[in-house]
Amino acid sequence: MGQKVHPVGIRLGIVKEHNSLWYAGPKSYSDCLVTDLQVREYLFKRLKSASVSRIKIERPSENVRITIATARPGIVIGKKGEDVERLRRDVAAKMGVPVHINIEEVRKPDLDARLVGDNVAGQLERRVMFRRAMKRAVQNAMKSGAEGIRIQLSGRLGGAEIARTEWYREGRVPLHTLRADIDYASVRAETTYGTIGVKVWIFRGEVLGGMEQVQEEQKQSKGAKKRGRG
């Protein structure tokens, strides 16, 4: 049987960045790793309505910097920044060190695998027909500029007695091409019939310049945001 490697994991350091950026010695490494997992789980659960795509954790010296990528930054920040300040205090209490929280806006949520997966899972929980939910998500992604997308659902689809797997694809999704910018996410939909697994692969084009190009594009987008605020 052919087995698939994680599309993001195999591209780390080539066209993808790590979600945790820090160094720790052998004694403290496991504690830092467990803390990262707990904080991510806590933030995804607390900010469920804010369409959070990615949580990046950095540990410079004796503090922690957390970057939250969200399609709805207003919900995270709150009125006059009250919500984000409360969130910062709660996370700092959990981690036991000073915490800085940065908010990053996801400009095209239809090209983000996590957000597309959450959207499809939400529709399944509201009893929307699974084929309609898949097709709508695929069409929106292609309209937003995706070169290819694949969505796969597994479970008791439509309330069927026997679980099965259905998938829908449009365009191309080259999993073997390492320079291909492929975003991947796996989400669960908790329906009345049981859990349905939702997997999303989105091909957003090829990155020919490697990590240098990725970092340059990130700098440009941050610069544009600062100019916009000014």
From Swiss-Prot:
Gene Ontology cellular component terms for the protein in this record: cytosolic small ribosomal subunit
UniProt record, GO biological process: translation
UniProt signal peptide: none
A single GO molecular function term of this UniProt record: structural constituent of ribosome
Record keywords, A-Z: Ribonucleoprotein, Ribosomal protein, RNA-binding, rRNA-binding
Chaperone listed as a keyword: no
Residue ranges occupied by any KH type-2 domain in the UniProt entry: 39-107
Function as written in the Swiss-Prot or TrEMBL entry: Binds the lower part of the 30S subunit head. Binds mRNA in the 70S ribosome, positioning it for translation.
Subunit structure, as described in the record: Part of the 30S ribosomal subunit. Forms a tight complex with proteins S10 and S14.
HAMAP family: Ribosomal_uS3_B
Family statement: Belongs to the universal ribosomal protein uS3 family.
Protein name, UniProt field: Small ribosomal subunit protein uS3
Originating species: Alcanivorax borkumensis (strain ATCC 700651 / DSM 11573 / NCIMB 13689 / SK2)
